[in-house]
Amino acid sequence: TAATYGEPESIPILESDKTEPTNPYGETKLSMEKMMKWTDVAHGVHYVALRYFNACGAHVSGEIGEAHNPETHLIPLILQVPNGQRESISIFGDDYDTKDGTCVRDYIHVTDLAQAHILAVKYLMDGGKSDVFNLGNGVGFTVKEVIETARKVTGHPIPAVISPRRGGDPAKLIASSEKAKSILGWKPEHADLEEIIATAWKWHKNH
């Protein structure tokens, strides 16, 4: 996960950048990476760690989608409003150092992530060494931009309410995925935010 980086020193984020998580989630993921590293050192078990940025979207067929209880991911939470499951969406902080004051994230479609997993397994089966790869589109969108795009996709006004910041939320997380493209041969195909949200909406409105 990109949460292993914490507050980045530069954008886009490289795999070689420092890892200083700012929340328990990122800390546990970084601990897992360290366990894999030491397992390799001790037993020669090679691994690939895939650092997802913001996983999102659903299968284009509309038959496979994302559901958590409780839900914590931004796009599914937004889509709960037009689905009649909540009255509004909360924006946690609008005073960040970004173009509209809300957090910026790099959204990557689940189908592209699935393809990266297949390529990572092939890489290891072909004798690849242990390594870490970022997975993102290299483009950031603010929370307000995501909400506005969801309004366009769904045709619903989706009321938004400004709430206090959440502790440990970095202002910007945008990936450099050039390493995955170069070494794994990964080619993400779903970079358009409107398309990503449309696939998610196709699933959520029927489930």
Language model region names:
Residues A3-N54, S61-H73:
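Catalytic helix-loop patch of NAD(P)-dependent Rossmann-fold dehydrogenases
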Residues L74-H207:
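C-terminal substrate-binding subdomain of Rossmann-fold SDR/epimerase-dehydratase oxidoreductases
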Residues I13, E33, V60-S61, M125, ...:
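Amphipathic alpha-helical interaction segments
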Residues A2, W38, L119-Y123:
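A generic secondary-structure signal
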Residues E9, K29, G57, V121, ...:
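Generic alpha-helical secondary structure signal
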Residues Y5, C56, V139-F141:
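Feature marks short, surface-exposed loop/turn motifs that line or immediately flank catalytic pockets
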Residues G57-H59, T98:
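Short, acidic Gly/Pro/Ser/Thr-rich loop/turn segments
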